[in-house]
């Protein structure tokens, strides 16, 4: 999807979701000493740093302020050599597209074998219950294709690759160093817990719900404290909260529990500043149902 398409999507989505409390991105900053994020309108991209090495999780929109905001975190785009891709939607791979600023032209990207079929043109991405095909994404970066359950090591960082299809056919989540789960667009956090991600954007809602059940059981067996980090609605370390409504869909226009921290318009970025990025840590999602 070209930069113009990204801008058009921004205008359309801003009008459609204004006041609906659907998108609640983190502002640019640090979750803890290992994980940082950049806010791009309603989306977050993430950086994981360990022993002086940094990898990136997703590549956001085709967004002209990415380099600037990475500077707020003291991360040089040229230092990024490895990017984990949860899925190929334009708000997760835009900075890799052919007409982007190509900040990461030399980086290797990692994605599932199934998800790569979108990039080769074997299948097309469909939304709105299969009624609308999205423009094909074009990326030239070197690719490493992953399989479900595969464990890889990048610069001493352990990455477990877990297939969670539904939003897209090859959506993958990444468990890093057994402590941080980057979930992309599989889980949507509401004020009262996690739901299966936005219904109108899924390839198969039925498969999404089934996949989340499998993921929850996978995590429960580990008996470990894990930070669950989403692409659009923040993070939590409460497993029960994250999966509380996993069998239900986030229906964009359905009335739900009010979240006083949700922005009226997620595409308005005036509160995302360098001062805040260099300030306090980014707080986890509040469970308003427990109040």
Regions found by a protein language model. Give the residues of each.
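C-terminal regulatory/interaction regions
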Residues: 3-9, 261-291
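Metallo-beta-lactamase
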Residues: 11-19, 23-26, 30-32, 61, 113-165, 169-241, 245, ...
